[in-house]
Amino acid sequence: MATYIQRVQCISALLSVVLTTLVSCQIPRDRLSNIGVIVDEGKSLKIAGSHESRYIVLSLVPGVDLENGCGTAQVIQYKSLLNRLLIPLRDALDLQEALITVTNDTMTSADVPQSRFFGAVIGTIALGVATSAQITAGIALAEAREAKRDIALIKESMTKTHKSIELLQNAVGEQILALKTLQDFVNDEIKPAISELGCETAALRLGIKLTQHYSELLTAFGSNFGTIGEKSLTLQALSSLYSANITEIMTTIRTGQSNIYDVIYTEQIKGTVIDVDLERYMVTLSVKIPILSEVPGVLIHKASSISYNIDGEEWYVTVPSHILSRASFLGGANIADCVESRLTYICPRDPAQLIPDSQQKCILGDTTRCPVTKVVDNLIPKFAFVNGGVVANCIASTCTCGTGRRPISQDRSKGVVFLTHDNCGLIGVNGIELYANRKGHDATWGVQNLTVGPAIAIRPVDISLNLAAATDFLQDSRAELEKARKILSEVGRWYNSGATLITIIVVMIVVLVVIIVIVIVLYRLRRSMLMSNPAGRISRDTYTLEPKIRHMYTNGGFDAMTEKR
């Protein structure tokens, strides 16, 4: 049976290698490099869909049951240091528990613990609606309450034992790692030293060791003790602090050695303080270790692009920043939520994305389908590192080779130039000097004739020159407009000015006064004439406004006519 299992494992590993090789070979990296597209060898994909939980109970004060009270004063001083560190943390946890409560608690018997978190209802007291941060804190609180009974038993047993590490497992398969610090030092060094050096010397040694331990404690768990949120555990400091092998501590994780390496490398082991006991000076941390699942036959390649030349014109191919290749699928990869280790991308979900058909065929080697755009500025990269060498566009850039700074002349039929330590050594691009890797090999990869697709709009069009011309035109038109305004302001100024209006008003007043004076003079003249010539003495030849018929009646003319009759 064991032989059969080994054969199955070997066949699975062989198939995985074959699939990975086929996937990596379907992207013609040499052909793409000739148009400035650089694609690396790729890394595998692992999905972190779930996690395992651990609880680390830290006993921060050793049990000092020494004779004659040796070391008691040093322990009291050490506890005062711990109080300043732990009291704010304890108060924050109390506030969290006051705001976030778990209802519908499931009763558990004393013998058989039951998992009741998934049946719990997370609610709030002081806040109306639970936010995501509150729910996260509520989950941690619920998990802490689940393990509360087991943690209490651990604390009780740790106060009665001198064992340094106890690994216990509760009923739901979660493990509580109890670390009792300094106990080995007290048992192995302090007690024997009392009989040899005396109480005072032993107490001083204990005080020095406690101070050293406090410093190492802050180094190992400073980020975790500074907040009630989730922080990465410093595993190297944990290993140094407790003189334990991290691999041995994590042997119970249901995962392979490579997964453990990826988890440690990316610092994905998170710890959260869920309990602070100031009576026993114990701190409980909830530790989450992600469970990784590798997706077979999948590689994620990092892609980039530099400018290249065709017939003296500079062009640029746009490609996704990351390419995901699967047996029959080629697309982009959204790694915004992923973390990268040396050999793997660890993602919470499948990062595959669809890309246009033309871009897909371009990545597969059909350069006639590559979407290109003409380079109109200097922001496009001109060189990149490939296989220990440098690929550069030496038509659009100034390239030199060797310590003598020999200029490099690029063939106009070639899009880029490949430079390595063997054919160049010291490489210079636009004044930047680069030393190629001595182990790098010639990366020319057989230069081929280049044909690319038509230029398309794949990014905002650069119209900086047109905008500059339009800006100059606007400035000129503004100057002309100001001149026109000045001319218009001068036209009609004589009647629009305030002095003109005042002059008109004064003239009108003078004319009005003259008219009034003339009327008064005429009136007085007529009056004087009437007073000097009464009505009876007016000459008949004198012209008056009175009708002549009136004189006929008043001067006897009518009586003469009667006598004649």
Swiss-Prot record:
In natural infection, inactive F0 is matured into F1 and F2 outside the cell by one or more trypsin-like, arginine-specific endoprotease secreted by the bronchial epithelial cells. One identified protease that may be involved in this process is tryptase Clara. Unlike most paramyxoviruses, Sendai F0 processing occurs on the cell surface and induces a conformational change in the protein that unmasks the fusion peptide. F0 maturation is a primary determinant for organ tropism and pathogenicity. InterPro entries: Fusion_F0_Paramyxovir (IPR000776). Belongs to the paramyxoviruses fusion glycoprotein family. Residues 26-500 are extracellular. Residues 142-170, 466-491 form a coiled coil. Sendai virus or recombinant F protein are widely used in cellular biology to fuse cells. Glycans are attached at N104, N245, N449. Residues 117-141 are annotated as: Fusion peptide. Residues 1-25 form the signal peptide. Class I viral fusion protein. Under the current model, the protein has at least 3 conformational states: pre-fusion native state, pre-hairpin intermediate state, and post-fusion hairpin state. During viral and plasma cell membrane fusion, the heptad repeat (HR) regions assume a trimer-of-hairpins structure, positioning the fusion peptide in close proximity to the C-terminal region of the ectodomain. The formation of this structure appears to drive apposition and subsequent fusion of viral and plasma cell membranes. Homotrimer of disulfide-linked F1-F2. Interacts with HN and M proteins. It is found in: Virion membrane; Host cell membrane. The cytoplasmic region mediates the interaction with HN and M proteins. The chain crosses the membrane at residues 501-521. This is Fusion glycoprotein F0. It comes from Sendai virus (strain Hamamatsu). Disulfide bonds join C70-C199, C338-C347, C362-C370, C394-C399, C401-C424.
